[in-house]
Amino acid sequence: MLDYLRDAAEIYRRSFAVIRAEADLARFPADVARVVVRLIHTCGQVDVAEHVAYTDDVVARAGAALAAGAPVLCDSSMVAAGITTSRLPADNQIVSLVADPRATELAARRQTTRSAAGVELCAERLPGAVLAIGNAPTALFRLLELVDEGAPPPAAVLGGPVGFVGSAQAKEELIERPRGMSYLVVRGRRGGSAMAAAAVNAIASDRE
């Protein structure tokens, strides 16, 4: 029999201990540091900490929104699948409309992506919601456009889209002009569905 650690709780404990020992978390307040640890745990890269941009109130604001029952709006089915429902404090609805037939029709009409169309279809649910965006820069760009057009902003944007085209630019637009939204995103090309879901999971419950 191979010799390896089998206890899930101990694997988690040791993993988080290694992350806290190796990552530079000094610039983060304690609540944000806990989220960053989760992001690192998801991707295995401690230098992610160097690229996290955030507003000081993001954990408190997103946490309060979730506690009040706000929905979690996701840009992809993968983000939605990664959110641990048992961690959500108020049986919060997890919404992803990327696979909705209406998104396909709207995307064709707008000549954009289904992810962007899915965000637009969620416009009425935006006020006070938590947005988990990990896949599509176009989804974040469309969110920013909707707020510019008068839609009430969500409480927070978490994660950040991954990619080589538009990803860094969409996040920088959010950072430079937050439009009343709190945020925690990974700058540059990195991001992804797993990171977006991890950010929600970390904020949804104090359990590490």
Curated annotation (Swiss-Prot):
Keywords: Cobalamin biosynthesis, Isomerase. It is an enzyme of class 5 (isomerase). Its EC number is 5.4.99.61. Pathway: Cofactor biosynthesis; adenosylcobalamin biosynthesis; cob(II)yrinate a,c-diamide from precorrin-2 (aerobic route): step 8/10. It catalyses: precorrin-8X + 3 H(+) = hydrogenobyrinate. The gene is cobH. The active site is at 41 (proton donor/acceptor). This is Precorrin-8X methylmutase. Pfam families: CbiC. InterPro entries: Cbl_synth_CobH/CbiC, CobH/CbiC_sf. GO terms for molecular function: precorrin-8X methylmutase activity. Coiled coil: none annotated. GO terms for biological process: cobalamin biosynthetic process. Substrate binds at residues 15, 38. It comes from Mycobacterium bovis (strain ATCC BAA-935 / AF2122/97).
